[in-house]
Amino acid sequence: MYKIEWQPKAYRQLNKIAEKKTKISILDAVDTLVNWPNCKQVKSLKNRNGYRIRVGRWRVLFDVAKKLKILKIEEVKKRDERTY
């Protein structure tokens, strides 16, 4: 099992989301990442290192330290042209 670490930037972005239902959905999706690499809806990013998971219109961008078994949640963004 992997440990999940929230970067300060990602934590601030999550707290700025107004809808409580959306926050809960994002937290539930992040909790499924502890079973890495057996996770659904995870895709590798093409233009930079890391991965993303889709939660409705939101994207959670993260990186994996495989040797340390740590997932670093780097950003939580609403999907638009500038997301990736």
Language-model features and meaning:
Residues M1-E5, K9, N15-K16, K23-I24, ...:
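Enriched for short, Lys/Arg-rich terminal
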Residues L14-I17, L45:
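Alpha-helix C-terminal capping segments
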Residues K16-K23, N35, C39:
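Alpha-helix boundary/capping and short turn/kink residues
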Residues A29-I53, T83-Y84:
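A short, surface-exposed loop/turn module that caps and links secondary-structure elements
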